[in-house]
Design a protein with these regions (language model features):
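Flavin (primarily FAD) cofactor-binding/catalytic cores of flavoenzymes
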Residues: 18-174
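Flavin (FAD/FMN)-binding glycine-rich loop and adjacent Rossmann-like elements that form
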Residues: 1-63, 137, 200-234
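C-terminal, flexible cofactor-proximal segment of oxidoreductases
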Residues: 5, 132, 143-234
Length: 234
């Protein structure tokens, strides 16, 4: 019951963020202002350029980070890093931030399938040229299923679904005496529109946009879609 309620609430909030993004954005920022007070520069430090859920939203249990800021235990600096210095970091505005430890939490580049060079029957296979079957299997790539979770829900929710699918697929293959399984475009799929792995209007963090050219394509038909929707996939 608790799991279903959480999933329902997440789905409802995501849907509302897409249907009425400006209202949701105003409400979220309003809650931040309520914690930090009228004198805090929320416009600079807590007003992103993107609409809600086009990039990840940080959940703050009981407003603990805002309480820490108000108590002087934490502070926010919104800037770009110019370089590391002997004492910490210097930003592009010239401010030096002293630091004992620097934890990199953004700006990374994705590593897709471990940068493995796939060779199928002696022919190299370029992963980005493949088309995904429901975001888990790929044309021209036999006996492989990629475990890729949800952006807006627990990653393991989709892992669960994929594990169940693999078990059913293996049982079916054993029954048929098959040792190889591979998805392929049908004749009626040959002219379907091919789309990026994720629609940039749906989800567009920098690390994903920088790596989109490495990822497979999805199709405009349901079988070749990558929905990121737990209830539809379940």
């Amino acid at each position: 019951i608790v799991r279903r309620r959480i999933l329902h609430d997440q789905a409802a909030f995501t849907r509302r963020a897409f249907e009425d993004p400006e209202t949701v954005k105003r409400e979220l920022i309003g809650m931040v202002r309520a914690y930090l007070g009228p004198d805090y520069d929320v416009e600079t430090h807590f007003t992103p350029t993107y609409r809600p859920w086009r990039q990840r939203i940080a959940f703050v249990p009981a407003g603990d980070i805002f309480k820490g800021i108000n108590a002087g235990k934490a502070s926010i600096v919104t800037d770009e890093i110019e370089t590391f210095t002997p004492r910490g970091i210097r930003t592009k505005s010239g401010q030096e931030l002293e630091a004992d430890i620097v934890i990199t939490a953004t700006g990374f580049n994705m590593n897709v399938l471990g940068d493995i060079d796939f060779v199928i029957d002696g022919k190299p296979l370029v992963f980005s040229y493949t088309v995904t079957y429901r975001g888990m299997m790929f044309t021209g790539m036999p006996n492989l299923l990629w475990v890729f979770g949800y952006f807006r829900a627990s990653w393991t929710l989709r892992v669960d679904l994929l594990a169940d699918f693999v078990c059913r697929l293996l049982a079916h293959m054993e029954k048929k005496g098959a040792k190889r399984v591979e998805v392929a475009l049908r004749p009626e799929d040959k002219d379907m529109e091919l789309l990026p792995w994720i629609d940039p209007e749906n989800f567009n963090p920098g690390y994903l946009m920088r790596s989109m050219h490495l990822l497979p394509k999805r199709g405009s038909k349901p079988e070749w879609a990558h929905t990121q929707d737990y209830w539809r996939e379940k």
